[in-house]
Amino acid sequence: MNKIFLILVFFFGSINISNAELNRIVVGNKDAKITIIAYESLTCSHCADFHKDIYPQLKKDFIDTGLAKIEFRHFPLDVAAFNASKISQCKSNESLKILNSLYSNQQEWVRGNTVEEINGNLKKFIKSQGFEINFEKCINNKEIEDFVLNDRIEG
């Protein structure tokens, strides 16, 4: 058992996330005294409910007033959420917009019986929203993959 644990620590401990191109999705004053960290899975209906119903009021009362900032981190619960998380990180200048769009329209892209079918829905959805992302290049990007996995491990 100890050998397996050491192997897992070595494997997961060696993930490199020091890529300057990848930024956390943070909303609010960077100097706010309170930091809210939200670990979310893009296929989780409760996470989507939080993002649509709770987050706007939280933003209005605490983030927009400068009292707090919120940092969205990835906690994919399945392969579809993992790929959607990678997509949300592909264009750092649009990450929050992509995240909002994925949660607001979760039922449009999350349905399907296979990962391939869901990926197809996700690809069509991203294109229909006007995001110019090379889907295959993005979901196969090792640095983005490591960034998302590191969030998952930390969470």
Where in the sequence are the language-model features?
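Cysteine-centric redox/oxidoreductase cores and disulfide-bonded domains
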Residues: 76-155
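Extracytoplasmic thiol/disulfide redox context detector
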Residues: 1-82, 127, 143-155
